[in-house]
C-alpha cells in the first residue's frame, strides 16, 4: 500500500510499514550508523534534534543504547517539521524511508530494519510552562534548555537537566535497568497489531486524528498532574 506526504519539495510517496511495541530488539550497530547519518544530514540543513525518552536514558545511564530497547527516540521542534519533511528525499538517498507519519507531530523513519521515532514538540496552549507532542508533555526546559553530550562517538543535544527529566519520565528508580518491553509476542498478537496498524493507515486522516485527540486528552492530563506533584 502506497501512502504520501506533501512537502515543499513535492509529493513524497512511501510504503506502509507495520511498527508496534515489542516488534524487535534494537540492533546497536545499525542504530549507531543510522543516528550518525541522520545527524550529518540534519547538521547540513541546520536542523537540530534532541536525544529523548529511552535513547536519552541509555545515553546517560549505560552510555549506550539500551539492550532491551527497540528504537531511537528523538525530539525536534514542530516549527521545523516542514523542513524535516523536505529532507525525506535526501534521507532516501542514504537508505532511509518514511515508515509512519502523523500530521499532529510524529513520524518514524527506517533504514536496514532499524527505525527512528521523531516527536515534534510545540508550546502547550493551556500552560506556558509546558511543551507537548501528541500525548506526551513535559516542562519546556526539557526541550529548550539543552547541552551537548558525548554519545556513540559523536556529540548530541540532550536536556541540560537530564537527571530531573529521567526522574519525571521513568521514576525515581530510573538508574536501575528494568525491562518493560516484551519481545516474545505470539503470531496471533503480531497479526492483530498488523491489522490495527493497517486499518489506521487506510482510514481517512480526519477520522484518525479525531480518535487520537480523544485518546490523548486523559494521557496528557495524567502527565500534567505528575509534573505539578513531582518534587
For each predicted feature, which ranges?
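Terminal low-complexity segments of carbohydrate-biosynthetic enzymes
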Residues: 172-175, 223-231
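Interfaces and regulatory segments of ATP-dependent nucleotide/adenylate/phosphodiester-chemistry enzymes
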Residues: 1-4, 212, 216
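Conserved catalytic core of two-metal-ion nucleotidyltransferases
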Residues: 20-43, 88-139, 143-157, 165, ...
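Short aromatic/hydrophobic-glycine micro-motifs
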Residues: 47, 93-96, 171-174
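Extracytoplasmic cell-surface/polysaccharide-interacting catalytic and binding patches
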Residues: 1-28
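Catalytic metal-binding acidic patch
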Residues: 63-83, 153
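Active-site nucleotide-donor binding segment shared across nucleotidyl transfer reactions
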Residues: 39-72
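Short, surface-exposed, low-complexity cationic segments
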Residues: 163-175
Amino acid at each position: 500500500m502506497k501512502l504520501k506526504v506533501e512537502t515543499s519539495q513535492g509529493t513524497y510517496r512511501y510504503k506502509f510499514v507495520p511498527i508496534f511495541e515489542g516488534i524487535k530488539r534494537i540492533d546497536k550497530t545499525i542504530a549507531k550508523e543510522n543516528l550518525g547519518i541522520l545527524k550529518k544530514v540534519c547538521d547540513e540543513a541546520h536542523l537540530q534534534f534532541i536525544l529523548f525518552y529511552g535513547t536519552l536514558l541509555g545515553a546517560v545511564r549505560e552510555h549506550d543504547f539500551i539492550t532491551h530497547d527497540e528504537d531511537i527516540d528523538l525530539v525536534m521542534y514542530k516549527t521545523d517539521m516542514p523542513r524535516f519533511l523536505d529532507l525525506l528525499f535526501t534521507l532516501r538517498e542514504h537508505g532511509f524511508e518514511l515508515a509512519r507519519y502523523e500530521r499532529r507531530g510524529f513520524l518514524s523513519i527506517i533504514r536496514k530494519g532499524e527505525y527512528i521515532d521523531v516527536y515534534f514538540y510545540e508550546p502547550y496552549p493551556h500552560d506556558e510552562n509546558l511543551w507537548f507532542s501528541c500525548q506526551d508533555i513535559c516542562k519546556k526546559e526539557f526541550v529548550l534548555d539543552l547541552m551537548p553530550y558525548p554519545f556513540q562517538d559523536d556529540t548530541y543535544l540532550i536536556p541540560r537537566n537530564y537527571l530531573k527529566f529521567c526522574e519525571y519520565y521513568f521514576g525515581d528508580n530510573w538508574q536501575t535497568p528494568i525491562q518493560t518491553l516484551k519481545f516474545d509476542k505470539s503470531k496471533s498478537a503480531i497479526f492483530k497489531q498488523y491489522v490495527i496498524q493497517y486499518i489506521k493507515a487506510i482510514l481517512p486522516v480526519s477520522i484518525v486524528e479525531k480518535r487520537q485527540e480523544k485518546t490523548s486528552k486523559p494521557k496528557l492530563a495524567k502527565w500534567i498532574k505528575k509534573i505539578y506533584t513531582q518534587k
